[in-house]
Amino acid sequence: MSRLLTLAIVFVGIVPAFAADLAFKDQELATKLTVGYAVRLLDMNGDRRLDIAVVDSDRILWLENPNWTEHVISQGQTKKDNVCFAPHDINGDGRVDFAVGADWRPSDTKTGGTIQWITGGKNPAEPWSLHPIGEHPVVHRMNFADLDRDGKQELIVSPLMGRGTTRPNFSETGTPLLVFPIPADPVRGPWEPQVICDDVHVTHNFQVTDINGDEQPEILLVSFEGVSLLEREPAGTWRRTLIGTGNQQTSPNKGASEIKRGRLAGGGDYIATIEPWHGHQVVVYTRPAAERPKLSKPGEQGDWLWTRHVLDEDLKWGHAVWCANLDGDDDEELVIGVRDNASETSKCGVRIYDPQDAAQGKWSRQLVDPGSVAVEDLAAGDLNGDGQIDLVAVGRATHNVKIYWNGAK
């Protein structure tokens, strides 16, 4: 079923002109989820169309474009719950594989948390085989990137908390950010992890990006401490710089939760977060006018604080962030997924923020289909080849998958 959505539009700050409307048509797919923990858009079968891959609590599945036929490629192979995955050709056979994080038990920081990878055959619709990588309690997020610029991608894994930490502050040990180089034989292994950062706490997500424009990958990491930038030094060590304080006024949850970097017109950029952890604020950081402070020696820590703008506080449990050019202008809109209803007038769902004067914190806000998806995760991509970026949201309490077809011209 699909329908044309009327968007509720409000403005954050004072904007000089009315922002162009974004028209979306929603389509709820037949697939029903237990919890849609994660979603990715990628071509699973080589037909040059983006399919929808989803992590469900006990399944990994993909929905085939254009009819969204459901293919379950893993069920019951991992310890419940599956919580994250990352696509990459791990074994070099030219077909996509997935690293998978499972045995999700957020209240247990001492045991559990499995890391594995699954691989399929020539027919990606048939069940895939599973191979272990390692374990760490509270495995939560993962992705692939070539961090050392050797032409090979590494698996980056972020647990949510440090091993053996306890509520409410989870402060006994830091949360390690783990990097697994792919071994020569990824089936037999061993997969040997490297720790590149372990002095932050409760790291809910990260993004690999090139924030310095030097064609070197950096990592943006959100935690109780706020927003950190991790940069690889020539010796191979990593330096952490605090660039955003997060929300330090709330307790025990504090800092920042989700993160994405977006593009502004004129070559600028912004960093978007949810604050505090599992929080009620949509926040954007813009680059400061002053030059970045220079450090005198390798490994030295220092702050490079960006300007913090709170765009929205009328939400409960923001849980997904994406940046995409939805209207064909020169900047990327900020897309936020809200997981819970705060009130009858402030519901879960997808929200879009369009920069009007980002440096001054002026953005327009559009509410898309309020109350329809308790958004656990979302992704953006052109699903029908019309040149417009569409949105896909997966739900927790709503157990659903919805496409928002972009009708912008």
Can you annotate each of these PLM segments?
Residues 18-409:
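Beta-propeller-forming repeat regions
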